[in-house]
Amino acid sequence: QGEVVGRLIPGESELAPALMFLADDTLETADREKAEARLQLWLKAHIDTLVKPLRDLEEGEGLEGLARGVAFRLVESLGILERSEISEDVRQLDQTMRAGLRKLGVRFGAYHIFVPALLKPAPSRLIAQLWALKNGSPDMPGLDELPQLSASGRTSIAVDPEISPALYKVVGFRVCGPRAVRIDILERLADLIRPLLAWKPLDPAVSPPEGAIAEGGGFTVTVAMTSLLGCAGEDFSAVLKSLGYRSETREIQRPVVAAPAEAAGAEVPKPAADDGSDPAPAVTASEDPAETPGAADDTSTVEVAAQPAAASAPT
C-alpha cells in the first residue's frame, strides 16, 4: 500500500547492506520475524539479480591463482579498475586466466579493467546507491543526477566540483580534467587512436590515414574523436593529457601552387585526362620573367598528440 516497511543501513560491504525493519508495534513477534525474513529475502534477490556479474566474480568459478585475485579486486571496486592500479597483475595473467575472466564478463581495456554489463542504467544506479549508503549519504550531491546522465546516453559531461570523484567512478565515469567521460567511451577512443599510433610510413606513395602523421608515432585529433566524446578544443586536449598523451607542435611542408597568369592570350595547356589533380598553372613569357614560386613550400604548424609512455593495445 506504499507504506515504508524498512530502511537500508550500512552493512559489512556495499553489496551487503543491513536492513532496519519498520513494523507496526502491534505485530506479534512471530509475524514480525516472518515479515522481516521475507523482506530480507527480497532485498538479497533484488541486489543479486542486478549485480549478478559481481556475484559470479565472487564465486570465481573456473578461476585460479592470480585470476581469482583480480576477480576479488574487481568485486571490491564494484566492477571498475583503472588498469594502472593493477597493471603488474594483468601482465602476469596468462591466456587461460584471461579467458576465464572474460567468460565472467570482464573486459581488458587500454585504460580500465571493467565489467561492461554493470554500466547499464539499472545496475549502475543500484551500485551508486549502495556505495553512497556505505561511503557517503543517501542525499550526497550527484547521486540522482549522475546515473540519469549516464542513462541518457551522454558520453561525457562537465565535472561538477561539488560531486565526489569517487562517485563519478562508481557510476562509470572517469574524471579527465574538466570533463568526466564514460569509461566505455574512453576505450572506444583508444580503439580509434591505436591504429594511428601504429601506422608507419613504409611506402612513400601511400598517404597516411586520417589522423595519422606522415612520419608516424603520433596522431592529430579527428572529428570522429571529438564527436565520440561530445567535446572539442581545450576540453578534449585536457582529456588526452589526463590519459598520458602529450601535445607537440610540429612543422609540416605544404606545397604552394603559383597563381595562373592573367595576361591576355596566355595559352593554358589542356590535360590529357582528368586524374583528380589540379592543372599546372600557365606561365607567360616576358623579357624579364619573374621567378615562379611553383617549387616553394609553405611552412605551417600542426598540433600532434604523441604516444604516452605506457600506451599499448589491451591484451
Regions found by a protein language model. Name each.
Residues 1-233, 238-239, 243-252, 259-264:
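Acidic, serine/threonine- and proline-rich low-complexity intrinsically disordered segments
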